[in-house]
Amino acid sequence: MASNNVAQFATELKMPADVLLTQLRDAGVEKSSTSDELSKADKDKLLDHLRRAHGVAPDGEKKKITLTRKETTEIKQADATGKSRTIQVEVRKKRTFVKRDESTPEEAPVKAAAPVIDEAEIERRAEEARRQAELIARQEADLREKQERLAKLEAEKEAQAKALKQAEQAEAEAQKADAAKPVEAKADESAQEEKKRVAAEESKKKAAQLAKDAAKEASEKAVATEAARKAVADEVAQIKAMMNAPRRAIKAPEPAAPVAAKPAEGTLHKPADKKAGEKKDEKKPAVTADKKSIKSANVSSTWQDDAKKRGAGIKTRGNTGGGRDGWRAGPKGRRPSHHDDRESNFQAPTEAVVKDVHVPETITVAELAHKMSVKASEVIKHLMKLGQMCTINQVLDQETAMILVEEMGHTAHAAKLDDPEALLEQGEEHADIEALPRAPVVTVMGHVDHGKTSLLDYIRRAKVASGEAGGITQHIGAYHVETPRGMITFLDTPGHEAFTAMRARGAKATDIVILVVAADDGVMPQTKEAIAHAKAAGVPLVVAINKIDKPGANMDRVKQELIAEQVVPEEYGGDSPFVPVSAKTGEGIDALLEQVLLQAEVLELKAPVDAPARGLVVEAKLDKGRGPVATILVQSGTLKRGDVVLAGSAYGRVRAMLDENGKSITEAGPSIPVEIQGLTEVPNAGEEVMVMADERKAREIGLFRQGKFRDVKLAKQQAAKLENMFENMGEGEVKNLPMIIKTDVQGSQEALVGSLQKLSTSEVRVQVVHAAVGGISESDVNLAVASKAVIIGFNTRADASARKLAEANGVDIRYYNIIYDAVDEIKAAMSGMLAPEKREQALGLVEIRQVILVSKVGAIAGCYVLEGVAKRGSSVRLLRDNVVVWTGELDSLKRFKDDVKEVKAGFECGLTLKNFNDIKEGDQLEVFEVQEIARTL
């Protein structure tokens, strides 16, 4: 479309019509409205105006020229085989020259003119011009003021010089008058003459003093005036220089040290380095009268190629300086590398820098070296001096790393990692949420076989104890029971000594402890331990004296034994109620529950309900069909299905929630035990459980805990290995019994591993290669093959593929469901690994009465058995004058001509000794044998 008016032309230029009208008026084209016609001359006039505004010559004169230079050279280079080959090298250089306008030297070169210019740009330029004009006006006014002050100072100086001259003339005339005055001695006028003379002398002194003062003042004024005049003159000269200087000129900084010339702009190849002699005589850019530097004045220096001169002469295969511009060939045909022959001016610091190094809980050698700004090899050297062999990826614990940092002369600080768990502390308080009464959590504790589970059985009216393997509890069970007085949550703990940690967890999570003591058995070791756990947790005790229906029950003895353990009954002034019960007949059960609820009322147990749930992992296991399953006791808040929970390093969304009877529920309040599914892994029993706001935060904290646990464990293992390295070298070789333990729940695994590791001695050690929750899989069998371990399954079984693999590789898999049996069998196996004890038993004493030398046989001794018996093949000691001369064994034993096995006391015999002939008459032989006796743990 032809643009023949202002509006159409503005549309074509994609700019507002009123802005285009303003630009047309500035260009001298008078157009008043957008409908006015535009001719080609008007458009050309506008274009010329815009070009001038942008610093482009209107006649289209070229102000920039680009020169391109291409140069091809050849170099000869030896390849990997030693043959010489020619390489073509092409160097392309490009240089651009810009012609600047001489009339406006202060303006910097501008870019090509834009097709249009907006109002904001015009206003900005006008404002800049106005500021420049104001600055020049101020500078001129300052200059005029300084010049006037200079003229005034010069006038004052002339006046002072004139006054000084007049004073000198007056003094000279006075002296001349005194010299020319005649001396007349008249007797009658002597008195008058004397008066005149005194007056003249006084006037002369006054005149001299006045002249001196005037001269001094004049000289001081002259010095001050001269200094002021010089200061004003210097200031005027500076202002003039500033006004005459080009406004936008940038002074090039003087180089602090000689450096190589900058490569030409646009070149595709690095220019050659200059020789040391040429650096001093380097040409400077020519400077014109208006102080404008011309870059083209030193163009020839840019194009110099000194590499040719440097490389001239006979080329040899050993010439390492071959090639252009410092490029050198790599050895044996490898890629060439560039070597800069210029010397660096950098000087290394003379003083050692002491750094503050913040050391986290775990750190690798490489990271520690980076923090200290040293090479990793230096850190490894210092570690070797400290007796530790390691690599750069080795993880060091905090203590070792801090010792190393101090050893290397730096300051070590124990630093905390960026702990995302700090975010958990923000949402812990529920001060604004009302706390409501909750049911008490009661833990039943006591010695094994004292009837804890049977007591709970009767309370729950269920048969649990009969289902336990061996009739003993090996898991911690959680149940809640509705009574007429309210709900009570019970935790049943094992009584066996192996389950110490499990009982401690039960005491930690509980409000009240029921201590079950058998009336016929009294206080036993685990009873004492349960009392200690309850006291450590600060939990009130209710003592249930069980089995009162048995004939051998003695309640008074039980009370006395408990008083000895600082558990005093209420009837004796203590604070622990004693209740006699019978789990078999149900006698005293109601009284026991009454006492429990009474204690709960005194404690005033409360917890927030409408809040995110928090609780404790009571037990955890890996179910083949359901995955990780955790039994949780909710302590506060309400746990709902679908909540995101975090338990130690395990996290996940609650997919299903079951009560202790296996029924599905949707939510659980305080003091309710539930079984949840959906966690990423089996959590450790005793871990705290909390509901998180979102899954991302739970995942972040869980992964952080996993990494932290792994790093700390690895660092501790490494430290333990290094500590025990030299100790083990000094002792004999310790025998290991490697084991892989798989259990049904986390608590059983913990108890079994602890019990087996307690069996370790200085000679035989139980090495638990791997311990986990769940069934025995193929990976467990493969691990057993690699580590030559025995697999123990506690209440678990191996699947079909694992059984086949174990049979094929001869891996021993043992199944147990009672912890006693597992511990006893492992103890027996370890006893078999012990080195047998050697005992020496004396058999008899033989006297040598005759020695017969036979050339082919050696010395034959004719002997008489004094006591005991002499057996063929037994060990003997040769005694000469009751001193042991030799220890060995009998080679042959004969009676007459027949070989015999033994000769008893009172009989004669002939014998030879193995590899020994130095026997004499009268020597005695002590016959003995060494017996090996099996040892037990």
Swiss-Prot record:
<dbReference type="GO" id="GO:0003743">
    <property type="term" value="F:translation initiation factor activity"/>
</dbReference>
<dbReference type="InterPro" id="IPR015760">
    <property type="entry name" value="TIF_IF2"/>
</dbReference>
<comment type="similarity">
    <text>Belongs to the TRAFAC class translation factor GTPase superfamily. Classic translation factor GTPase family. IF-2 subfamily.</text>
</comment>
<dbReference type="GO" id="GO:0097216">
    <property type="term" value="F:guanosine tetraphosphate binding"/>
</dbReference>
<feature type="region of interest" description="Disordered">
    <location>
        <begin position="250"/>
        <end position="346"/>
    </location>
</feature>
<dbReference type="Pfam" id="PF22042">
    <property type="entry name" value="EF-G_D2"/>
</dbReference>
<dbReference type="Pfam" id="PF04760">
    <property type="entry name" value="IF2_N"/>
</dbReference>
<feature type="binding site">
    <location>
        <begin position="446"/>
        <end position="453"/>
    </location>
    <ligand>
        <name>GTP</name>
    </ligand>
</feature>
<feature type="region of interest" description="G1">
    <location>
        <begin position="446"/>
        <end position="453"/>
    </location>
</feature>
<dbReference type="InterPro" id="IPR027417">
    <property type="entry name" value="P-loop_NTPase"/>
</dbReference>
<feature type="compositionally biased region" description="Polar residues">
    <location>
        <begin position="295"/>
        <end position="304"/>
    </location>
</feature>
<dbReference type="InterPro" id="IPR013575">
    <property type="entry name" value="IF2_assoc_dom_bac"/>
</dbReference>
<dbReference type="GO" id="GO:0005525">
    <property type="term" value="F:GTP binding"/>
</dbReference>
<feature type="binding site">
    <location>
        <begin position="492"/>
        <end position="496"/>
    </location>
    <ligand>
        <name>GTP</name>
    </ligand>
</feature>
<feature type="region of interest" description="G3">
    <location>
        <begin position="492"/>
        <end position="495"/>
    </location>
</feature>
<keyword id="KW-0547">Nucleotide-binding</keyword>
<comment type="function">
    <text>One of the essential components for the initiation of protein synthesis. Protects formylmethionyl-tRNA from spontaneous hydrolysis and promotes its binding to the 30S ribosomal subunits. Also involved in the hydrolysis of GTP during the formation of the 70S ribosomal complex.</text>
</comment>
<dbReference type="GO" id="GO:0005829">
    <property type="term" value="C:cytosol"/>
</dbReference>
<keyword id="KW-0342">GTP-binding</keyword>
<feature type="compositionally biased region" description="Basic and acidic residues">
    <location>
        <begin position="173"/>
        <end position="205"/>
    </location>
</feature>
<dbReference type="GO" id="GO:0003924">
    <property type="term" value="F:GTPase activity"/>
</dbReference>
<feature type="region of interest" description="G5">
    <location>
        <begin position="582"/>
        <end position="584"/>
    </location>
</feature>
<keyword id="KW-0648">Protein biosynthesis</keyword>
<dbReference type="InterPro" id="IPR009000">
    <property type="entry name" value="Transl_B-barrel_sf"/>
</dbReference>
<dbReference type="InterPro" id="IPR023115">
    <property type="entry name" value="TIF_IF2_dom3"/>
</dbReference>
<dbReference type="InterPro" id="IPR036925">
    <property type="entry name" value="TIF_IF2_dom3_sf"/>
</dbReference>
<dbReference type="InterPro" id="IPR000795">
    <property type="entry name" value="T_Tr_GTP-bd_dom"/>
</dbReference>
<feature type="region of interest" description="G4">
    <location>
        <begin position="546"/>
        <end position="549"/>
    </location>
</feature>
<feature type="compositionally biased region" description="Basic and acidic residues">
    <location>
        <begin position="267"/>
        <end position="293"/>
    </location>
</feature>
<dbReference type="Pfam" id="PF11987">
    <property type="entry name" value="IF-2"/>
</dbReference>
<dbReference type="InterPro" id="IPR004161">
    <property type="entry name" value="EFTu-like_2"/>
</dbReference>
<feature type="domain" description="tr-type G">
    <location>
        <begin position="437"/>
        <end position="606"/>
    </location>
</feature>
<dbReference type="InterPro" id="IPR053905">
    <property type="entry name" value="EF-G-like_DII"/>
</dbReference>
<dbReference type="InterPro" id="IPR000178">
    <property type="entry name" value="TF_IF2_bacterial-like"/>
</dbReference>
<feature type="binding site">
    <location>
        <begin position="546"/>
        <end position="549"/>
    </location>
    <ligand>
        <name>GTP</name>
    </ligand>
</feature>
<dbReference type="Pfam" id="PF00009">
    <property type="entry name" value="GTP_EFTU"/>
</dbReference>
<keyword id="KW-0396">Initiation factor</keyword>
<feature type="region of interest" description="Disordered">
    <location>
        <begin position="157"/>
        <end position="230"/>
    </location>
</feature>
<dbReference type="Pfam" id="PF08364">
    <property type="entry name" value="IF2_assoc"/>
</dbReference>
<feature type="region of interest" description="G2">
    <location>
        <begin position="471"/>
        <end position="475"/>
    </location>
</feature>
<protein>
    <recommendedName>
        <fullName>Translation initiation factor IF-2</fullName>
    </recommendedName>
</protein>
<dbReference type="Pfam" id="PF03144">
    <property type="entry name" value="GTP_EFTU_D2"/>
</dbReference>
